[in-house]
Every structure is written in structure tokens, then in C-alpha cells.
């Protein structure tokens, strides 16, 4: 369908199998009956299919028509997803066809159609005579048509098999699950875009006979996105495959498609309706029993003060369904699931059990006595697998339901703060706030009618709340606002402007470091000793000058006026002469000394400087060498810290964002200005003198990102502004970086966005290559390890040469990074020898600057936007990763890589994945698979050290 005009394809659902294809085409080509027009094609898929109109306007009219009926059956239509180019459907398979036979048959069809043989995979199917085959290379619509023609001519085990294209799927199916997956937990997980890549669901149902669980999404893009990721839930890896109704057994498919999608479902069926307004994701309705009368539910809202003893909420198994904000539902098959409902709906107080011992109740903010907060989320409650001891008694009761409304965290707090009395007045409904990282909102328990009325009331209240995003212009605002002082500031503004601030978006703008750890820049304070040494040099120059003046005085040292005393006298040289005249009667006797103390001062200064220079030239040269080495080490450490602590500008584009919920009447500009003024009052400044040296722009930019400060150049000084201790830390860091002058002709070592290597670019200190002798032990070790990981391509790769990569500065930074990981990392080993294939043009850059992300990572971003390394060289020698040059030579680096603790990688990552949901601590690297990782992705430039460069080439067939 890539050639089909946009909007011309419609998806047809609810089609009984007895309606022939000819009737379908005639009906939708009849302009008077259906509003349609000429059809290009009709692709039938089970109890539905895809209509492709020649004119998109015809498809638009068909959609606009209120109803379509054939043989008394109401048909459902909606825009169709585009064709899936890497997927084909095979139907009319003979019984007992194995997946291997099916894959071999598809490969035979590809060969017969003139296509190169490619890897294909037959996916698990609930129906034996239909199967879906996933291809490794996409096919065009014309190529699929040619393949379908070959399928009619080439039988499979004596049976004629039909082949057809399928659209992108809207549904996925969970198969091969080792243990049953909790359906409510699965639903919440797949609705969470951050956790699973999913989104709003259209329905969720279990197929009979352990054929799998079908999850339908409202958007096909979401389903396809979910299929591209790996999924883990409760320690179990989920196996997800595309799902179409045509793959289901005929009786089941007819039952699903034949129902009226607008009808109310029976108890025990789960489905989804479109998302409502006001930030609601829908309401979950559960028909359950209860041990108390509905009138007693209101007592939950009037429970005792904060911290009063509570009672854990047990879990019960019951019938589940999803109800939209307008009450519409979608029918699907019965399933079983679990959720929470209080065993006893009454006062939550308990004399014998304290609130600290209860797993499900917690404290709420001051002034929220009417609302009992839940610790964790609905997902956490389900994961605990609690069982209700009162289940049998509850089954005797009828008419009570439970609803879960998904609401943004800021909106929940706003309702709790400013509508407390109104919420507490709901007599017949128990209202529980859900405040967690995955699900936030309200749980309503009670009779159906009061719960629906309470739901409508909450929707109305949510409609009166406006949500705005405020951008923080000051560096370090996110870190400050998440601290104690920042929280106090936000609370004061909330009380002043009747609003609620949400800090959930601030965590991504802060550094992924532990804020409680020791300041790493304290080690750089050795610079103070260097400054003291300069002062001592100045004092020694004064001593030499005094000694020379004393030796040249005709009256000796006792009559000589010290130079310091002359400077301290208020008068000029004239006053000095008058005092000497009063003490000594003979003026002529004093004229010569006076002339010596004034006219010869410049000569005396020159002699003192010369004598000091002669003296210093006689000192040991080792002291100078030691000082230079210490300065180099100090600056190398500062550079390493600058890279290791670089701020991760992910999700917010490097700018912190604060979410605010308030009423529509509130002036948001006034609120934003008040917040900006309050932040200005907490800013601190530090000044660092450049001492006549230049500050490279790249250095200043990295320093700002590293310490969350702003650096402004004012004459010969740099003014650092930020919050808390950050300006002081940045000042220490900058002082260490300015120990020696920067060579302005060299690119900044950590900034290689525009690499510019001259002829001496591979000389020290940037890096150099040194060829290894083939008979050396080092050469043999590198070659042996390389060949042992080539796997199937072992006999097709020949090594041309091996070179050692030397880069002292990068090695120092790497060692510092390694020592830091050795102390904090739990995974062992921390360090691994990996391979990195690259192009010829990138070799010089890597040798000079290491594995910098600005010119690495161009070949793939499937597991993150970092630098990729392979555990086995067989992956690195592929032409995709190490393209050969004009002479056929390929470049593969051997590298020591600090993989540390690694997490699951995913597309779009600009930093390692978070360790724990809701915290800012991250893993050290990302991998393709947690169980057996083959690919590692790093995000710090000092995390990998190139040790050897292997130049190799492919051996052509027949080459000796």
C-alpha cells in the first residue's frame, strides 16, 4: 500500500463469513448505497479486511455515512493502517505444517519469484491453517503480488496455499508465557508509554486453550512500537507477536466480530473505550461484592487525622471491564484478573495495628485528613499478589463496583488541596488517591450509581484546572528545586497563588549522580599550594633586594632605612631628606646616600632580579619537572571530572521544566515572574581570575553543563553563577583547568564535534599509532583473541596489520573513571575487552580524541544514541559497521570498555537507562539483551580506551 494515495484505504470489521466478496465490492462501489466509488482492491482478512478506493474522497464519504449494514449486520469502518512490508499471511495450510516447513516454503517462493533468499520466521498462530511469516527484508506491493502468484503455482505438501499482504497491526498477542500474567498488571504496563512504549488500549482479552492474550491498541503506531521492544514483567520476559483476527479459530473470530461494539459488556469481560477529557485515561469498573453497606463507604473520606492506624487492602479476583468516561464499552471475551478492594469498608482505624505496619496505606499532606493516600500504585498492589481472606463473604454481596480514574499527579494534588471539603462530602463513595510512578489518579469504591456520579463530578473539577509548563532559565534550577530549600520555595508560592507545582519533569534535567556523595573537586584544591609557591617567590625577591641595598650603603646595615619603611611614610622623597637633615648637621655628608636610595632604585631592582635568576638556575631541575608533572596530572584529573560529570540534557533539551496546575483565572505570567524572582534571590556568585590566559569556548560550555552554573566573561575574570555549592565547585574546577596555558591551535581534548587534525595530529599528547611486529607476543595475543570471536566468518577475514594506540591523557582519564566504577559498581567484571568497527575517515578522530559520540554511533541507534561495542568481532567486521575503503581494507578497534552495571537499551536513549523508576541514578551502560549481551552502548567519552587498531580485509572466494 505504499503506492496507495493517503486516506484511500479503509479497514472493515464485523463482517460475517457468509457474505461473499463480490457483494462487498458491489456495495462499496455503489455511490448511492454506501457513498463510495471505484475500488482498486479488496483484501479479505478473516471477519474483516481492507478496502482501497481509487479516490480518497470516496473513502471519506464512506466514513462519514452514519451506518453501513449488509444482510442486517452492522459493519464497522475506520482508516486502515499502511501495509506491513515485512509481513505476509499464508492461509489454507495443510494440517500438521511445522514452522520450519513453512519457512522453507516461503524461501522457495522467494527463489521462484527471482528474489534473493532471506531469513524468515514463522510466528506462533492460534489457528492451524493460517500463519504469519516475518521477513527480514521488506517487499513492495508488486513483489508481494508476484509472491502470491508463485504460491498458487507451488503447492505445500500437496495443498495450494494462498499468500496475502497484511496491514500494520493494531493488536499484539502474548504467547509462550511460562506462568500466567496478571491481566490488570499487563494492562497497566502496556498503557505506560515510558515503561513499555505502549499507549491507550482498545481492549484486552484472553484466547481459550492457552492460545495467548490479545491486547488491542487505539493506534496502530503504538502496537508496532511495542513489538520492536523487549518486555519484562515480574521477572518474566514477555513474548509478543503481531495479531490479526484472521489468525483466531473461526468460531472465536465470529463471536468477537459479530458483537455490537457499542453494547454494554457482560460481567467478566475486559475492554476499552476512547479516552475521556480532563486528563482521564478511562475508568476501570469491577463488579464485586462487599462486606458492608454502601452507606458506610463515606466513612473512609472522614477517617482520622494524618497517620491514624489503617488497614491493609486485600486483593480479590473478580470480573473486570473497562468503562470509558462516557460509559461506552467494547465487548471482548471473558478473562479473569485481580484488583484491590477493601475487605471491610468502614472506619480505617485499628487499635492493634499501626500505620507503619500496614502495606497499602500511608500519610498524606497536612490538611488532607479526609483523603487517605496509598503508598505505591495500583501496579504495586497487584504485584504483591495479596489474597482476600473475606472473599467468600464478599461474593454474597451484589451491586458494588470499583473504578480507577487515571489523572496527572499535579491534578490529583490540586484536588486534594483545594477541593478537600467537596470530595469529603461524597457520602456513599470511598475515594482513594493513587500516587505512584506508573499510575496516578483516584480509586472509587461503592454502588454503581454513586460511583458514576462521583466520576462525573471529578471530570467536571478536572475540566476547571489548567496545566502549564514553565521553563527554568537558570542553570541548576532543577537540582535546586528538588532540594529542601527549593521545596520550601515552591510551597510558599503554592500558598500565595493557589496552585500546585509538579516536579516529575525535573529529574531528567538533573545529573545522574548521587547528590550526597563527596565533592569530587575537593581533590583539585592542591592548586592552593601552587599559588603559595608564587607568593614565596615574591618574598625571596624582596630578600635579595634588601641584601643588595644593605651591601651598597656606606653606613652599613644599621643606618640604612628599609625600603618597606620608605614606602610606608606618608610623605615623598622630600620629607625623607628633611628628617635626615635634622638628625645629621652636615648636609653634604647625607647627599650621597640620598642619591643612592632614589636614583639607583631601578638599577637595584634589576640587580636583585638578576641575582635571583642566577640562584634559581643553580637549583635542581628535578623540582621543575616535578612541578610540571603535578600540573599536568592536576589538569588531566580536572578534564576527567569534566567529562565524567557532564550533565545529561535528556528529554527537556537541556532546560528544566516545571509543571504547574492552577485555575483558569490565575495569571500564569505573574506566577512565572514571581518564581523567577524567587530563584534569583537564591543565586550565588564566584569569581575566578584568568591570570592573562584565554578561556576556550568549549571549556566554558562544558564547565557550565558539568556544574549547572552560568559562566560569564568580565574582562580578565570569569563570573560563575548558580545555586548552593555549585559555583564554588565550578570555581575550584576552573582554577585547576587553568594551571597551564591552553594551546589555542589544538582542539579542546573533550570536544571533537569539528575535529581538525594537522600533520602532527597523531603525535603526543593527542595520540599515536605504533605498528606491532608479527613475531611479538603482543601481536599474537591480539590476533588470537580477534580470530577466536570471528565465528562463521573466521575463514573469510585476513589481518593486514595490527597497531598499538597510545594516548596518555585519555589513558589517565580512563583510569580515573575505572577507579570510580570499581568503588560503586556491583556488576563484575567492570571492564571488558570489546570491538568497534568503524570507517577509515573516523580512525584518526578516534586515535586523537577517543570514542567521542560526535563522530561515533552513526551506524545505529537501536539501543541508544551512544558509542556501540561488540562482544564478538564477527559483528564488527560486517561491512555495515566497518565499511572497506577503496583498497578493501577494514578498520576494527580493540578497546577496553568500562561496561559496569548495565541496563536494557532502547531507541532514543541519550544516557544510560535509569536504575530505579523515579530516581535519577542511572546504569553505567546499555545492552541489547540483559541475559546474554552481545552489544554494549556507552555514553561517556572516557568510558572506553582504544588499545589496538586491526586493519583487515575480506578474503574473496578462490583467493589462496
Curated annotation (Swiss-Prot):
Which top EC class is named for this enzyme in its record?
Answer: transferase
* Residues found modified as ADP-ribosyl glutamic acid: 103, 831
Q: What is its EC number?
A: 2.4.2.-
Name the family. Answer: Belongs to the ARTD/PARP family.
Intervals of motif Ubiquitin-interacting: 604-621
Q: What is this protein called?
A: Protein mono-ADP-ribosyltransferase PARP10
Q: Which organism is it from?
A: Mus musculus (Mouse)
Which SUPFAM superfamilies does the record associate with it? ADP-ribosylation
Amino acid at each position: 500500500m505504499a503506492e496507495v494515495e493517503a486516506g484511500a484505504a479503509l479497514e472493515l470489521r464485523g463482517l460475517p463469513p457468509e457474505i461473499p466478496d463480490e457483494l462487498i465490492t458491489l456495495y462499496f462501489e455503489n455511490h448511492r448505497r454506501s457513498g463510495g466509488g471505484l475500488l482498486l482492491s479488496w483484501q479479505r482478512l478473516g471477519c474483516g479486511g481492507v478496502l482501497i478506493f481509487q479516490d480518497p474522497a470516496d473513502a471519506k464519504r464512506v466514513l462519514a455515512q452514519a451506518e453501513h449494514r449488509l444482510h442486517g449486520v452492522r459493519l464497522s469502518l475506520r482508516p486502515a493502517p499502511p501495509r506491513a512490508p515485512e509481513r505476509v499471511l499464508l492461509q489454507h495450510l495443510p494440517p500438521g505444517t511445522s514452522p520450519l516447513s513453512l519457512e522453507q516454503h516461503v524461501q522457495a517462493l522467494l527463489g521462484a519469484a527471482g528474489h534473493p533468499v532471506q531469513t524468515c520466521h514463522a510466528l506462533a498462530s492460534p489457528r492451524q491453517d493460517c500463519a504469519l511469516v516475518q521477513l527480514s527484508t521488506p517487499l513492495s506491493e508488486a513483489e508481494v503480488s508476484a509472491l502470491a502468484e508463485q504460491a498458487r503455482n507451488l503447492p505445500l505438501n500437496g495443498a495450494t496455499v494462498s499468500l496475502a499482504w497484511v496491514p500494520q497491526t493494531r493488536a499484539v498477542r502474548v504467547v509462550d508465557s511460562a506462568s500466567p500474567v496478571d491481566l490488570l498488571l499487563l494492562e497497566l504496563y502496556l498503557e505506560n508509554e515510558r515503561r513499555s512504549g505502549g499507549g491507550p488500549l482498545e481492549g484486552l482479552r484472553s484466547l481459550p486453550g492457552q492460545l495467548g492474550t490479545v491486547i488491542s491498541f487505539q493506534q496502530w503506531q503504538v502496537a508496532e512500537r511495542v513489538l520492536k521492544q523487549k518486555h519484562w514483567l515480574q521477572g518474566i520476559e514477555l513474548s509478543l507477536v503481531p495479531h490479526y483476527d484472521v489468525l483466531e479459530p473461526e468460531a472465536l473470530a465470529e463471536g468477537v466480530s459479530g458483537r455490537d461494539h457499542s453494547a454494554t459488556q457482560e460481567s467478566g469481560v475486559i475492554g476499552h473505550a476512547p479516552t475521556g477529557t480532563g486528563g482521564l485515561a478511562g475508568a476501570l469498573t469491577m463488579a464485586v461484592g462487599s462486606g458492608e453497606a454502601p452507606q458506610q463507604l463515606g466513612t473512609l473520606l472522614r477517617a482520622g487525622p494524618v497517620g491514624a492506624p489503617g488497614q491493609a487492602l486485600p486483593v480479590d479476583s473478580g470480573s473486570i471491564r473497562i468503562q470509558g468516561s462516557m460509559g461506552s464499552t467494547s465487548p471482548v471475551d471473558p478473562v479473569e484478573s485481580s484488583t484491590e478492594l477493601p475487605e471491610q469498608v468502614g472506619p480505617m482505624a485499628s487499635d492493634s495495628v499501626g500505620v507503619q505496619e500496614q502495606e497499602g496505606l500511608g500519610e498524606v499532606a497536612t490538611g488532607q485528613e479526609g483523603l487517605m493516600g496509598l503508598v505505591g500504585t495500583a501496579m504495586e498492589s497487584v504485584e504483591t499478589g495479596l489474597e482476600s481472606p473475606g472473599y467468600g463473604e464478599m461474593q454474597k454481596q451484589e451491586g458494588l463496583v470499583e473504578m480507577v480514574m487515571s489523572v496527572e499527579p499535579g491534578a490529583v494534588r490540586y484536588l486534594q488541596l483545594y477541593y478537600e471539603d467537596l470530595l469529603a462530602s461524597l457520602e456513599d463513595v470511598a475515594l482513594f488517591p493513587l500516587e505512584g510512578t506508573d499510575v496516578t489518579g483516584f480509586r472509587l469504591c461503592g454502588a454503581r450509581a454513586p460511583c458514576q456520579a462521583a466520576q462525573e463530578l471529578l471530570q467536571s473539577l478536572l475540566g476547571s484546572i489548567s496545566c502549564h509548563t514553565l521553563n527554568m532559565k537558570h542553570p541548576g534550577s532543577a537540582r535546586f528545586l528538588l532540594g529542601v530549600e527549593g521545596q520550601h520555595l515552591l510551597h510558599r508560592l503554592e500558598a500565595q497563588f493557589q496552585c500546585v507545582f509538579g516536579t516529575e519533569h525535573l529529574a531528567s534535567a538533573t545529573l545522574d549522580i548521587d547528590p550526597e556523595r563527596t565533592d569530587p573537586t575537593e581533590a583539585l584544591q592542591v592548586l592552593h599550594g601552587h599559588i603559595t609557591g608564587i607568593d614565596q617567590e615574591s618574598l625571596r625577591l624582596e630578600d635579595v633586594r634588601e641584601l643588595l641595598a644593605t651591601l651598597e650603603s656606606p653606613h652599613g646595615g644599621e643606618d640604612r632605612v628599609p625600603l618597606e619603611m620608605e614606602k610606608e611614610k606618608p610623605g615623598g622623597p622630600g620629607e625623607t631628606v628633611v628628617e635626615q637633615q635634622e638628625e645629621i648637621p652636615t648636609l653634604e655628608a647625607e647627599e650621597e646616600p640620598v642619591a643612592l636610595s632614589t636614583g639607583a632604585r631601578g638599577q637595584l631592582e634589576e640587580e636583585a632580579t638578576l641575582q635571583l635568576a642566577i640562584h634559581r638556575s643553580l637549583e635542581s631541575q628535578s623540582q621543575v619537572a616535578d612541578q610540571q608533572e603535578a600540573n599536568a596530572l592536576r589538569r588531566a584529573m580536572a578534564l576527567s571530572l569534566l567529562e565524567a560529570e557532564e550533565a545529561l540534557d535528556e528529554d527537556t533539551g537541556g532546560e528544566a521544566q516545571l509543571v504547574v496546575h492552577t485555575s483558569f483565572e490565575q495569571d500564569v505570567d505573574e506566577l512565572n515572574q514571581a518564581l523567577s524572582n524567587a530563584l534569583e534571590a537564591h543565586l550565588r556568585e564566584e569569581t575566578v581570575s584568568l591570570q592573562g590566559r584565554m578561556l576556550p569556548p568549549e571549556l566554558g560550555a562544558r564547565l557550565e553543563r558539568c556544574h549547572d552554573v552560568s559562566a560569564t566573561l568580565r574582562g580578565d575574570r570569569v563570573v560563575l553563577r548558580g545555586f548552593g555549592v555549585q559555583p564554588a565547585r565550578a570555581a575550584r574546577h576552573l582554577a585547576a583547568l587553568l594551571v597551564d596555558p591552553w594551546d589555542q591551535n589544538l582542539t579542546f581534548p573533550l570536544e571533537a564535534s569539528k575535529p581538525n587534525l594537522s600533520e602532527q595530529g597523531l603525535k603526543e599528547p593527542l595520540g599515536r599509532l605504533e605498528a606491532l611486529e608479527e613475531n611479538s607476543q603482543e601481536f599474537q595475543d591480539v590476533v588470537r583473541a580477534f580470530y577466536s570471536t570471528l565465528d562463521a566468518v573466521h575463514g573469510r577475514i585476513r589481518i593486514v596489520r595490527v597497531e598499538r594506540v597510545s594516548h596518555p591523557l585519555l589513558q589517565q582519564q580512563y583510569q580515573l573513571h575505572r577507579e570510580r566504577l570499581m568503588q560503586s559498581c556491583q556488576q563484575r567484571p567492570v571492564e571488558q575487552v570489546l570491538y568497534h568497527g568503524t570507517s577509515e575517515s573516523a580512525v584518526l578522530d578516534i586515535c586523537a580524541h577517543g570514542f567521542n559520540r560526535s563522530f561515533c554511533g552513526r551506524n545505529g541507534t537501536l539501543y541508544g544514541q551512544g558509542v556501540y561495542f561488540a562482544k564478538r568481532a564477527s559483528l564488527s567486521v560486517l561491512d555495515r559497521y566497518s565499511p572497506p575503503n577503496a583498497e578493501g581494507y577494514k578498520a576494527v578497534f580493540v578497546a577496553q570498555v568500562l561496561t559496569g552495571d548495565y541496563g536494557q537499551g532502547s531507541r532514543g536513549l541519550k544516557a544510560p537507562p535509569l536504575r530505579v523508576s523515579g530516581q535519577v541514578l542511572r546504569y553505567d551502560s546499555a545492552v541489547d539483551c540483559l541475559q546474554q549481551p552481545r552489544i554494549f552502548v556507552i555514553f561517556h567519552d572516557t568510558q572506553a580506551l582504544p588499545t589496538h587498531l586491526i586493519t583487515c580485509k575480506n578474503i574473496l572466494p578462490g583467493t589462496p
